[in-house]
Amino acid sequence: MSRLRLLLSDSHDPLFNLAVEECIFRQMDPNQRVLFLWRNANTVVIGRAQNPWKECNTRRMEEDGVTLARRSSGGGAVFHDLGNSCFTFMAGKPEYDKSVSTAIVLDALTRLGVEAFASGRNDLLVATPDGERKVSGSAYRETHDRGFHHGTLLLDADLGRLANYLNPDPKKLAAKGISSVRSRVANLCELLPGIDHPQVSEALQEAFFSHYGERVQPEHISPEQMPDLPGFAETFARQRSWEWNFGHAPAFSHQLDERFGWGGVELHFDVEKGVIGRAQIFSDSLDPAPLDALAARLPGTAYRADALYDLLRQWRSEFAAREAELEELSRWLLAALR
């Protein structure tokens, strides 16, 4: 058996690619050195300990069809599109060493004609007339006997969209969890016009082979060519689930307020594991009974619009005399939780 393994994904589905990565990592021979190359279409990828409602503009993401994906490693939130090239290096311990994989990526960039250097927060930077700019970010994961280093290279990413989706709505969130630190970034196409994913992929493969003094044939993976990985279907289902991508968020509090013609409303939610644990509703409405009833029903409900839709419809039906007012409040609340 070769000590190297090279896998290339033909899928742009981030949930598929992250599930493949997870299965390979769990099942790899610890004596092998693995390189997995992939790309994702429009996606915000958040770190394992992050709160998507705090990190992301979830409303704009839904409107624009942008996927949210939680990865198993730490670190901050990043936006992926097809202008990013993604890489994952895996190895067993004690050979796993992220400085080795970083050196391989730097060698690949040198082969392409870009002189980059490693910086403190897991980034690769280049010097430009405007100062140092980030062209690659990484995150890491280790278990008792293996580890991986994965990251992205910015080729021709839409940096404006990155800023749009990584800025949350002005919601009043008091959240626990890890916040992303924004960095000044640059695309490699600014330094190498015409650079594309196949060129970067080829350079990474050559640097990988050169470092280990061995070559292997790539294994191509796609949804049409499902990977022969035990447990993949279950891992893929988990990666796609709301419970993992949203429900795994750290505990946080959310405050919403709005003034309607019939009175002002202020809602306070405590949310844990994506479920409303406590709800308080304050109002100067002349008839607060419907709001008291709603506050009593909200605990135990998933913190998402589709889960609240049926609850709100049933609640309104019990206060038919105020149907128009409660419909107005329901529309506002559902829009706020998107």
UniProtKB/Swiss-Prot annotation:
It holds the Pfam family LplA-B_cat. Its EC number is 6.3.1.20. InterPro entries: aa-tRNA-synth_II/BPL/LPL (IPR045864), BPL_LPL_catalytic (IPR004143), Lipoate_ligase_A (IPR023741), Lipoate_protein_ligase_C (IPR019491), LipoylTrfase_LipoateP_Ligase (IPR004562). It catalyses: L-lysyl-[lipoyl-carrier protein] + (R)-lipoate + ATP = N(6)-[(R)-lipoyl]-L-lysyl-[lipoyl-carrier protein] + AMP + diphosphate + H(+). (R)-lipoate binds at K134. Pathway: Protein modification; protein lipoylation via exogenous pathway; protein N(6)-(lipoyl)lysine from lipoate: step 1/2; Protein modification; protein lipoylation via exogenous pathway; protein N(6)-(lipoyl)lysine from lipoate: step 2/2. Residues 29-216 form the BPL/LPL catalytic domain. GO terms for biological process: protein modification process. One of its GO terms (molecular function) is lipoate-protein ligase activity. Keywords: ATP-binding, Cytoplasm, Ligase, Nucleotide-binding. GO terms for cellular component: cytosol. Belongs to the LplA family. Monomer. This is Lipoate-protein ligase A. The gene is lplA.
